[in-house]
């Protein structure tokens, strides 16, 4: 009996050490409007070297590992998907059917793509579709290049602060009612040390989101280009402080979409960088047949890689 008690005591003393060496597995899906946006997001928010294994023109999969500030190890199954087809999300069906755990969604928007008028419609469609594909989701919306907000106001005659605020309140309301986090990513390239500090900040933010950790220390609601609002940290009252005339509950109503699209301006000239090297305009949605790849073959390779990694 004494030997048993001694063994139990030894196990108890070393339990925390044993647990600290375990690796938790997470599933994350990045849904991006373009390859360029995806490349930038991975470069900013993921560990160095992730771009080469996650970059894609349509769909990809890889496993990324990291150790957080608590010395906890994580293995993250990351899927990347480009929103350049009208049924892109359906490509994830076979992979989502394999999962029984929560899926972290990182839905990207990009201030440099001149498609702000479409954001609400695209988010509504994506969230509804995702909820049909999977029951257990953790949502986040990431708006890249939010420093472009200042350029739009400085260098165009159509963009004013009222438009920026209207988009912000719309996104905050949508995320509030859909239990989603909202993060603006603003890079400052003026100083190398500051740029590196920003990347470390956003990498920490991503880790906290994926690990379901408390994010109250990461809240920013004042600086328009640096908004950081984790799920559960916003409210109707806080949203209205931007402009009290805005009614957050209206975002849930069908008529609001038309109002949003009518109010948000566009720039006359669509930028050339929205076209891929193959000449496909990412402002438009195309059937999968347009892309010069064998979709079934690519999915087969990706699924084989997933099964090998998962040891199914």
UniProtKB/Swiss-Prot annotation:
Classification via InterPro entries: Dynein_light_int_chain
What Pfam families does this protein's entry cite? DLIC (PF05783)
Keywords, in A-Z order: Cytoplasm, Cytoskeleton, Dynein, Microtubule, Motor protein
| Keyword Cytoplasm appears in the UniProt entry | yes
What Gene Ontology terms describe where this protein resides (cellular component)? Answer: cytoplasm; cytoplasmic dynein complex; cytoplasmic microtubule
Q: Where in the cell is it found?
A: Cytoplasm, Cytoskeleton
Biological process terms in GO annotation: establishment of mitotic spindle localization; establishment of mitotic spindle orientation; nuclear migration along microtubule
Name it: Cytoplasmic dynein intermediate light chain DYN3
Gene of this entry: DYN3
